[in-house]
């Protein structure tokens, strides 16, 4: 039925195709009979040969421009033409069709390709109607091929008849089927990669051994069969031809026996081979899995850490002598060639234990904002936790022990600790001595006089020595404590006296005029109250006998406890230069020098007048002078 239909439809296709070009052979006309020039067709890019243009492989719709007897010319838009077409349509989407300037309804078919008519018969498998073209002309998927887009159209169902016709033409073609298959690109050509299955060496060697053993077994069986056949032939020749029936029977029995024996031998050899195979132990060398830290191997990472530790130890980078990052990087660059690994270590090694487990890498920003690195003990983090220090960079000062206050000065803490230990040892020794003394008293009470005298001679000598040493130590410590207490008490008294003196003698009347004292042979000084006072040659101020009774009463009322305490053999003298606590040697030397030199007899006004407290009665006059000789002491208090 199909052949009759083919014969009836052929004249119509020949007439339509004859208007364009005159066919040279009926078989080629049948191959391109369903193709019309000027029409648009959808192509099957999967059957394109390898030498076809790349743009044609990505295009879905082409136009037939010319049909000849041997080939078909196609025109199709390039990707640049499609992009320009869609860009222009997107820009002028809101304009009416009449007002649009430039551009067209369809993209420009600026590419062309010529192919064989046999290939075109299969490639152009569906004709696109004009109304479908007008509806889908602004769709990108309509022009560009895609697997999802091609699956929507049933290709082979629509073109079953033309494809059948092309197959008939290929069958009737004088070139044969092979040439058409070669032209259609069915053969693998240069540039194609073939899949190769790789097997490891131990599998290949095992297969080779198995093949060699099986071939050896087969060769042995074959040789045995040949030997048996030769023996059978020799036996047959010797017997002769008189007994042919008996010979045939014997030959049949022999063949049966040979077959049975050969099968038994093969089975035995197979069993032995299987047993050997079961007992065989195959050892494979498996490569150990390489472990990585980030993107570097463990060996390489550990080597870089060791080199970094070596550089920091050479530079003595410890707490207080840290090394800056640029200097450390330049030195470590000589040993660590991978700069990426070097920068990674500089960034992430802070807080990690160095190789060896004794040191720890540390880093922080200094006051200038630069990064600095140093090494510290790996146990220091546990010491901080036990001491209760929250500062991650705290380092114990020298002399610090676990249990001391972290905020206290270690020198003071050490001295206080030593004093406490000495006092504790003294207390223990005193307790021992007291206990020994009690024991000795008990022994004296319990033993007779003769025994006591003999025992005392033996026991008292070392005890007396120990007791004497302890008493010496005790006296020394007590003397030191007494000296310290007296010094502190004198300092407190001097400070109170100085404060009281400044408060009492600070000038409240700046307009008052005071006359300076004279050094030697001065006339009597008349005070505001009419009291007369005389300056002796020894730089001492004395009062007239008329005012002594008044002074005594006034002294009893106004004399301070400090003046009572200071009522000693020392006398309050006129200060030389600066007011100081009197010292007899220094004061005598200063007095002699002042008395001998006439230049010192002139008095100078003092900006801070001080009125000293006398032993008997406080004077009402101030001494405004500031003579500071070089020999005078500089300290305010000389205890």
Swiss-Prot record:
Entry GO CC: nucleus
UniProt-listed GO biological process terms: female meiosis sister chromatid cohesion; male meiosis sister chromatid cohesion; reciprocal meiotic recombination
Name used for this protein in its record: Protein DYAD
Sequence segments annotated as region (Disordered): 201-256, 536-561
Entry keyword Nucleus: yes
UniProt keywords, alphabetically: Developmental protein, Meiosis, Nucleus
Compositionally biased intervals (Acidic residues): 227-237
Mutant phenotype after disruption: Plants contain 2 cells with prominent nuclei in the central region of the ovule where the embryo sac is normally located. Sometimes, an unreduced diploid female gamete, arising from apomeiosis, can be fertilized by a haploid male gamete, leading to a viable triploid embryo.
Tissue expression notes: Meiocytes (at protein level).
Nucleus as UniProt keyword: yes
Superkingdom: Eukaryota
Segments forming domain PI-PLC X-box: 351-498
Bias type Basic and acidic residues, positions: 201-226, 546-558
Localisation per UniProt entry: Nucleus
Major localization listed first in the record, in broad terms: nucleus
Primary role: Required for fertility. Involved in chromatid cohesion establishment, in chromosome structure during male and female meiosis (e.g. the synapse formation between homologous chromosomes, the recombination, and the cohesion of both chromatid arm and centromere), and in axial element formation. Regulates the switch from mitosis to the reductional meiosis division of megaspores prior to the female gametogenesis (megasporogenesis).
Source organism: Arabidopsis thaliana (Mouse-ear cress)
InterPro entries named among the record's database cross-references: DYAD/AMEIOTIC1
